[in-house]
Amino acid sequence: MIQDKTAIRPAATVIVLRDRASAPKVLMGQRGAQAAFMPNKFVFPGGAVDLQDAAVPLLSEIPNPCKDRLSEESEGPSAQALCAAAIRELFEETGQILGQQAAWPDPVPDGWQAFASKGYRPIAEPLQFVFRAITPPGRPRRFDARFFL
């Protein structure tokens, strides 16, 4: 199946803060010059929601009001899939694990083997949904992104 690159894809992004109260610092990466989406730009860790993110067994529940806010006026991936995607993308792009040591039930969803091999299960409890942004028309790739702290 060929994917329509111009279709708006659901995505999840994590804003990682350190020393929030005294001297805040944020974690960002710079995209490559050849990237189709936002080349050379500094971005937060994140990316598209994959189908298998909906099957990820989160170790903790998504807290309210985060779960309710993620579901408002939204057709598309579940709150669970959005949180799982945020956690997966954070791990893939930075190596940071948002999880607790625990065994995974079999089978581990595709795309999650590296995370599971570390002996951790993803936890959504620390995630705080901040805002939603849709890439404007005219870009080569468009995303309907949810941003988490």
Predicted features by range, described:
Residues M1-L149:
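N-terminal leader/linker segments that precede catalytic domains of diphosphate-processing enzymes
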